[in-house]
């Protein structure tokens, strides 16, 4: 996954990541792009939410459970690795969570992206359709925002979060933990886990970089 790119070749990160200014343009279109089609706007919200939640993958975002959020703390296990992920929910992310909060009491899911009523292959197919549509709408978003020369997909937020963190000199071990990776096991045998407050600061550094355009190097001070 991304961790392999951080430790080894950076080429695959660059292929999926965008610059801070490009992400800003995607999340805050120029005046001519303000009236986005509804489905494109929803895809933009998903992109923003994935970014604000420490580069959370769409698979994890769509399958978040209502019980996973307590106050402004989101705690879940990654579907791919089973690694526990704890994210402090910033106000804008909470606004989007509330906007898409699932009102169906019979569904276990926090967000209304999936029905929560399907099982097995039917549930798998539903998720596949949602993911394909998200990627299609993100391509439309990039074209409408004048960045159609870059490939934007459900991976973009995650890879961009990791890349910008690295540009801001955040230690790779913190990036790995922020993303909920199970890799870098050798490093983790002698490194303490980073607490939630430190990861929240990392996330805020990246958010500020994208929204203000000001790059601030990571510091624990």
Where would I find each of the regions flagged by the language model?
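Single conserved hydrophobic/aromatic residue that forms the stacking wall/gate
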Residues: 1-8, 13
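Active-site/catalytic core of tyrosine-dependent DNA strand-transfer enzymes
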Residues: 17-19, 23-24, 90-149
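Short, basic (Lys/Arg/His-rich) helix/loop patches that form interaction surfaces
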Residues: 28, 32-38, 135-177
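Short, charged phosphate-coordinating catalytic segments
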Residues: 50-71, 173
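Conserved tyrosine-mediated DNA breakage-rejoining catalytic core shared by Y-recombinases
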Residues: 63-99
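Short, polar N-cap/turn motifs at the start of nucleic acid-interacting alpha helices
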Residues: 67-75, 151, 170-189, 214-221
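Catalytic-site neighborhood detector that most strongly recognizes the C-terminal catalytic loop/helix
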Residues: 78-82, 179-204
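C-terminal secondary-structure termini that scaffold catalytic or DNA-interacting sites
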Residues: 105, 113-121, 204-221
């Amino acid at each position: 996954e991304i961790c392999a790119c951080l430790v080894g070749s950076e080429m695959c990160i660059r292929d999926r990541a965008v610059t801070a200014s490009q992400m800003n343009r995607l999340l805050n279109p120029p005046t001519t792009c303000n009236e986005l089609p509804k489905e494109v706007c929803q895809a933009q919200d998903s992109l923003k939410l994935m970014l604000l939640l420490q580069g959370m993958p769409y698979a994890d975002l769509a399958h978040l459970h209502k019980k996973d959020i307590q106050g402004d703390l989101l705690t879940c296990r990654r579907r791919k690795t089973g690694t526990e992920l704890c994210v402090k929910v910033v106000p804008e992310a909470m606004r989007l969570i509330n906007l898409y909060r699932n009102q169906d009491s019979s569904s276990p899911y926090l967000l209304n992206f999936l029905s929560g009523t399907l099982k097995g292959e039917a549930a798998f197919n539903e998720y596949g359709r949602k993911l394909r549509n998200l990627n299609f709408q993100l391509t439309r978003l990039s074209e409408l925002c004048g960045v159609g020369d870059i490939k934007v997909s459900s991976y973009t937020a995650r890879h961009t979060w990791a890349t910008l963190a690295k540009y801001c000199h955040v230690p790779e071990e913190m990036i790995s933990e922020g993303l909920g990776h199970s890799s870098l096991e050798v490093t983790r045998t002698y490194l303490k886990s980073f607490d939630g407050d430190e990861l929240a600061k990392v996330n805020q550094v990246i958010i500020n970089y994208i929204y203000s355009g000001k790059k601030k190097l990571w510091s624990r001070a």
